[in-house]
Structure formats: structure tokens, C-alpha cells
Amino acid sequence: ENRQIPLIKNIIQASDLKVQTGGGVRSVEDVEKLLHEGASRAVIGSLAVKDQDTTQTIFKKFGAECICLATDVLPQNGEYMIAVSGWQEGSAVTINDLIEGYLDVGLKHILCTDISRDGTLGGPNIDLYKTVKNDFADIQIQASGGVSSLDDLKVLNTDGIIIGKALYEDLFTVEQALEAAAC
């Protein structure tokens, strides 16, 4: 099991930025390692669906400020269904069910990806983020999937935005993105 902890540590040490990291987080010990190396927040995805007891233990041990739930969704029949295991498996859990399951342990942060739009440059799923924000006004939402333009950043009413392919394709710069998102 290669968790890339040394690489994550190097990234954290090379920057004054807060670093949120995840991928393959499956235990209390995994979260402990990430936070010990200086990550400000650990992202938990599949574990939150597959093992709610362990995930709640993580929230209680480290505090909600240090945990972000990855809510990777696929729109299906008017619902946003959670996908797990690197998007390889569907689940019977809706995004609302997942969020509601962690409110009692203080859930504050979600990274919400519409996986049908991720990497497509097809624009973000504005309705998804509006719905989640309306249903859970106190949750900090990081939007992910489909960002293709600076206009996308201006219309997303979320607390953070994940940008991938648009930067790789040089559609705009990080500086331009920060300026657009600040509007």
C-alpha cells in the first residue's frame, strides 16, 4: 500500500498554503498520518459510505474542521447517487442521505463532484450545488467537475472550486481563476 505520504509531506513543506488531501483513506490511522504530516484536512470518500462507524470515529477523534467528505455523485432519475471505489461502483445512497448521516458529528465540509461532468469541460452542474446549498446551508461546499471557463467560476455559488482539465488545457491561469472567483 503506497500512500504517497513522503510526497504529500514534501508538498506541504514546500508551500504556505493549506493542503487538503485524500484518496484511499480507509482508517483512523490513515487520517492520523495525513494530519500528522501537516495536511489541514483529510478527504474521506468511499469509507463514509461503506463504514459509517469508522468515519464517525474519525470525526470525533480529529474534529469536523479536519475532515472533508468526498461526495462523488452521478445524477440518476432526479437523484444524486453516491459512487464509491474510485467511481467504479454505484451505491444506493443519495447525497442527501450521506450528508444527513454525518450532521450529528458536526460535518462542515464536502467536496462534491458530478462525475458525469468531471474532465468534460462541459460546465459545472449548477443545479446540483444549488440544491445541496439550499438543503444544507451550513455545509461548506467545494464544487468539482466540468469547469471550463472563468464564467463558470463566477456563477458557482460555492465555498471552493476544484479546477483540473481547464488548467491543463491552458484555458485560463490560476491567477485569472482566483480573480474571477473573487467576484
What is each residue range found by the language model?
Residues 33-54, 114-117, 145-149, 158-177:
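Glycine-rich phosphate-binding active-site loops on the catalytic face of alpha/beta enzymes
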Residues 55-58, 125, 153:
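Distinct, well-ordered alpha-helical segments
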